[in-house]
Amino acid sequence: MVYNNLLERFIKYVKVNTRSNPTSQTTPSTQSQVDFALQVLKPEMEAIGLEDVHYLEHNGYIVGTLPANAQHLTRKIGFISHMDTADFNAEGINPQVIDNYEGGNITLGQSGYLLKPDDFPQLNNYLGQTLVTTDGTTLLGADDKSGIAEIMTAIEFLVANPTIEHCEIRVAFGPDEEIGTGANKFDVEDFNVDFAYTVDGGPLGELQYETFSAAGLDVQFLGRNVHPGTAKGQMINALQLAIDFHNQLPETDRPEKTDGYQGFYHLLDLSGTVEEASSSYIIRDFEDDSFKSRKAFIEQLAQKMNDELGENRVVISLQDQYYNMKKVIEKDMTPVNLAKEVMEDLDIKPIIEPIRGGTDGSKISFMGIPTPNIFAGGENMHGRFEFVSLETMEKAVDVILGIVQKP
């Protein structure tokens, strides 16, 4: 279905810089997210007919309710999207709208960059559709402002069409998903639903209830610096220790060499001097046993290197970040089956695959609200080649509307 305000709403949202900050100690991590919630979303949520719209200062979520209008629809269903965008330039976002995409390269503003089917063959799936792209200097922010726009548009449509019967709907727009902390303080009691969906997926038909289990790893390497001219048998180069550590990780277990259900170790940062160095990794896997094995391997590697050095010069810090929500959701597949049924009713082929990442739904599911993920439309997210199809966004609205009407 065509929704008149969807494109305008989406463009308005993405023009606001809501980039999160991984080094911040506050929640939300940036003031721009607070301003977006209070100055943009809150008045609009109230204007389209949501009730009890309130901002939770302790966690940065803006929440609202659309009461049920049919006694026989007794479920309470939530829809969640995140306000922040990823770690890429988000200042001065200037979206381009390509009507009736005919194929071929898309020039991204005056940046000199091209969005090319040779590089991104999925572009060929969107012939004849309306695409929104960047101008090549920023990301777009479809992750996840497409989700916010879709949820808002669905609510607006229901309020404007009161003869459409629906269950109670609660919506929540939150901070800091991209830096992995947004759902840490999610208020389950305040949200009070039977189950929920994050509208944070990619292409048409995505329906996901499996995520990685995730850990963060920080490693400190303690060296000993002496003059290189007299270093034999005395110098311990901390940077060399970091290199040796990394080279003992399985070469095939890297993001660029894995897919499907394969896990990995991913080096994010390595810096230092001869005297002291540090590296940061993320560790990902799907199954409990293999996730535990990866962490155990790290501990054993550090111990092995320290034994060889004769002292503790490799110091590790491992922190679990989130877990595969399949463990929770498979106990009651109602939200997955409901979304699947709605997609099939709309002639959308459900693509049920694991998320090679995480969503806020991972943590929220373990807090007691099963929260699978449905598509929002974004492609090539987190960079200058990001784009979204308006037609896919419209179908995401259709799915939301279908879910809340199901008995």
From Swiss-Prot:
GO terms assigned for molecular function: metallopeptidase activity; tripeptide aminopeptidase activity; zinc ion binding
Membrane-spanning residues where? Answer: none
Name the needed cofactors: Zn(2+)
- Please name the NCBIfam families in this protein's record: peptidase-T, PRK05469.1, PRK13381.1
Q: Which family does it belong to?
A: Belongs to the peptidase M20B family.
Functional note: Cleaves the N-terminal amino acid of tripeptides.
This one is known as Peptidase T
Gene (UniProt): pepT
